[in-house]
């Protein structure tokens, strides 16, 4: 294998009994047992037990001095472990290595934590990331990430895709998330932007005739971070020419099935279900529904229009209001304390409260219900609620009534909270499996109340459905896009669309977004020009590599599948980035910092 070692520690098995081996690695733990020293030696493949006998005084003296995380090399003979001392949890658990020679390659200061401590704070882990990455789970996560990327490349290469790099330094187009800006030293007052995606470049590669493109690349967005977001993230970016929307979806659905099978031996559905955006929002309040949770919304807006209860009738009679019920089978067993906790939970999403009805006996109608709101509802409304929700004895119905967005967010989050709870799992409301689906037919635009204009729901290069082209100039809100998202267990794995490939249509979309011809030419003139040279029909999508690996690894955060991630404050605790820079560097970039204005208190 090399002059320093013959095998990886974790790969020494009973097949090597009787053989001499040379091993290198780190001391996981050292134990003294009755004059014999045992060392758990670790490398990236796992652990092996090394036995140091005092019969070899020089070696034994070295073994007495080693401590956790010392980097060492040993030579010795593989032998079976004594009966009753085998460790079934280790690949090397049936053997041990009797040490002949031991060399300390490099000692270690006392580590700030034990590598097998499962209760470390994330701050500690990220500050000492070099040590954190030695932990078996992190080694597994990053090797899984490599395997997923390799499987993606193998699949796309076999399908005739070409890996082409696109620029990291590009032009700022302030649509969507904030750009990370890079000042140009040689062009004073001018800035590059780090790419939020290679979107326009990959479209131009289709115009250039490359037909099938991909790259696994870094993208950058200066936005507020959550558990599934990073300022820099890795995208599996793909684009194709001369394929229909259905053909694009079929191709990448097959890719994802292949990658899951080869990377973690999981068989995803032979055919992913397809759901329109409108249906997903109606049933689940989300465009990325977690289908493992067997709870759905019941639409009650019409039912509540004439009730004498403003909490329900107000939103029901509002243009952008919505009233829904969420029936939880067996939820009558949920305690008042748990209901209060759920009420506080939905408040995070803007809900002003959480109305509920416990169904004790359906047959008794009003008299069989338990809730402070029942007195505010007339008999016809109660009957319709029970009928539409399909309520049974022992159920609870939660209600959301507010602006549609608040209802969707709050009750959608409550649906997941209940489904993933111990109650949900123990009562069959949660199915522990893989549930992929496509969400299609997104609105082309959504209305921005603050700016009083239409904005692109995905991006302004998404094609509207052919029969909706007429609405671009008359009623943009009616436009449905040829857009699609692949969703898995409530996470958006990837998303894309068929693109606009005609310059006249692209210009109409810009105008619908209140981007006039002059502004469009200044920002996107190079794309508009390219589309005039016989641009082919094309489309594609991009997958989030970080998210895919996070799901496969069962990790809590994408920070657990990235070697050196940023915190939720976009900081690297290991290197202390971002940092201040020298005044000289700022002068070279023609930049002067303004002092921050002091915060005033009322």
From Swiss-Prot:
This is Aspartate--tRNA(Asp/Asn) ligase. Gene3D superfamilies: Bira Bifunctional Protein, Domain 2, GAD-like domain, Nucleic acid-binding proteins. It holds the Pfam family tRNA_anti-codon. L-aspartate binds at residues 175, 221, 458, 499. The gene is aspS. ATP binds at residues 221-223, 230, 492, 544-547. The keyword Cytoplasm applies. The record marks 33, 84 as: Important for tRNA non-discrimination. It comes from Cupriavidus metallidurans (strain ATCC 43123 / DSM 2839 / NBRC 102507 / CH34) (Ralstonia metallidurans). It comes from the Bacteria. GO terms for molecular function: aspartate-tRNA ligase activity; aspartate-tRNA(Asn) ligase activity; ATP binding; nucleic acid binding.
